[in-house]
């Protein structure tokens, strides 16, 4: 029954209650009056509850501002050393200890690692190192975040072995720079190879100096041959 109808019934019961003189009739009307008032109260509560629900549904959804990570910076500066069990890579990043733990991620494979630091001062930082000099244990490798520093711990697959370089590429580049000496050839031939490399890599002044020394050496040899 609508609230308006209940209100009309209540008014009529009140009128009858005022006119009634017999106790039995008055008790019945009083009980009916209480019943109608309770129904009206329940109707009003239901109406208020529905109104509140409608207002909640009409509220705009809260807008969550996206976390801006800006652009990604590639990390090129780092230091490293080693122990019998680990190769340790040190990366300096100011404030890295203040970002959430889940923002510092490292993925390991047997011959590589990939570091990603997200949302540090509005930027992300990335470092990918492939072709490690020797295999590492993926399960035994880990990271530590210290004050302004990320420490990457690569567990050596074979302990008590020395790494002269961090990567295979670095090793190959360094070995190319070394002059090649063949211990089985004549020492003078090895010296000539070194001089030849210096000549090829040198500037014009260096080439003139070597040419002059070469001519003087040949002249001395020729002079020595004629004295015997």
Swiss-Prot record:
Q: Which InterPro entries match?
A: CacyBP_N, Calcyclin-binding_UBL-bridge, CS_CacyBP, CS_dom, HSP20-like_chaperone, SGS_dom, Siah-Interact_N
Q: Where would you find this protein in the cell? A: Nucleus; Cytoplasm
Post-translational modification N6-acetyllysine, affected residues: 8, 19, 85, 118
One annotated GO molecular function: tubulin binding
Q: Which UniProt keywords apply?
A: Acetylation, Cytoplasm, Nucleus, Phosphoprotein, Ubl conjugation pathway
A Pfam family recorded for this sequence: Siah-Interact_N
Stretches the record annotates as Interaction with SIAH1? 2-80
Q: Where is this region: Interaction with SKP1?
A: 73-228
* Keyword Cytoplasm included in the entry's annotation: yes
* Domain CS residue range list: 73-167
Q: Which residues carry this modification: Phosphoserine?
A: 3, 34
Q: Which GO terms describe its cellular component?
A: beta-catenin destruction complex; cell body; cytosol; extracellular exosome; nuclear envelope lumen; nucleoplasm; nucleus; SCF ubiquitin ligase complex
Q: What result follows from mutating residue 64 to N? A: Abolishes interaction with SIAH1
Q: Which GO terms describe its biological process?
A: cardiac muscle cell differentiation; cellular response to calcium ion; cellular response to leukemia inhibitory factor; heart development; positive regulation of DNA replication; response to growth hormone
Q: Does the keyword Phosphoprotein apply?
A: yes
Region annotation (Interaction with S100A6) maps to 154-228
Modifications the protein undergoes after translation, according to the UniProt entry? Phosphorylated on serine residues. Phosphorylated upon induction by RA or at high calcium concentrations.
Q: Which PROSITE patterns match?
A: CS, SGS
Outline the extent of the SGS domain: 168-228
Q: Which residues carry this modification: N-acetylalanine?
A: 2
Subunit structure, per the record? Homodimer. Interacts with proteins of the S100 family S100A1, S100A6, S100B, S100P and S100A12 in a calcium-dependent manner. Component of some large E3 complex at least composed of UBE2D1, SIAH1, CACYBP/SIP, SKP1, APC and TBL1X. Interacts directly with SIAH1, SIAH2 and SKP1.
What function does this protein fulfil?
May be involved in calcium-dependent ubiquitination and subsequent proteasomal degradation of target proteins. Probably serves as a molecular bridge in ubiquitin E3 complexes. Participates in the ubiquitin-mediated degradation of beta-catenin (CTNNB1).
PANTHER family the record matches: CALCYCLIN-BINDING PROTEIN, CALICYLIN BINDING PROTEIN
**What protein is this chain from?**
Calcyclin-binding protein
Taxonomic lineage of the native organism? Eukaryota, Metazoa, Chordata, Craniata, Vertebrata
Q: Its encoding gene is what?
A: CACYBP
């Amino acid at each position: 029954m609508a609230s308006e109808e209940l209100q009309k019934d209540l008014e009529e019961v009140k009128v009858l209650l005022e006119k009634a003189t017999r106790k039995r009739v008055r008790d019945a009307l009083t009980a009916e009056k209480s019943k109608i008032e309770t129904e009206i109260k329940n109707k009003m509560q239901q109406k208020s509850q529905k109104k509140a629900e409608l207002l909640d549904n009409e509220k705009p959804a809260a807008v969550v501002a996206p976390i801006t990570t800006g652009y990604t910076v590639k990390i090129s500066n780092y230091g490293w050393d080693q122990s019998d069990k680990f190769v340790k890579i040190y990366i300096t990043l100011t404030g890295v200890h203040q970002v959430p733990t889940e923002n510092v991620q490292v993925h390991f494979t047997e011959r590589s690692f990939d570091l990603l630091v997200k949302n540090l001062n509005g930027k992300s930082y990335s470092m990918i190192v492939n072709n490690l000099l020797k295999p590492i244990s993926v399960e035994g490798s880990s990271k530590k975040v210290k004050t302004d520093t990320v420490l990457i711990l690569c567990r050596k697959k074979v302990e008590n072995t020395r790494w002269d370089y961090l990567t295979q590429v670095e090793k190959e580049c360094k070995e190319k720079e070394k002059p090649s000496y063949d211990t089985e050839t004549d020492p003078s031939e090895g010296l000539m190879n070194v001089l030849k490399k210096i000549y090829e890599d040198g500037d014009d002044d260096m080439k003139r100096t070597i040419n002059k020394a070469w001519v003087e050496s040949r002249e001395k040899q020729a002079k020595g041959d004629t004295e015997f």
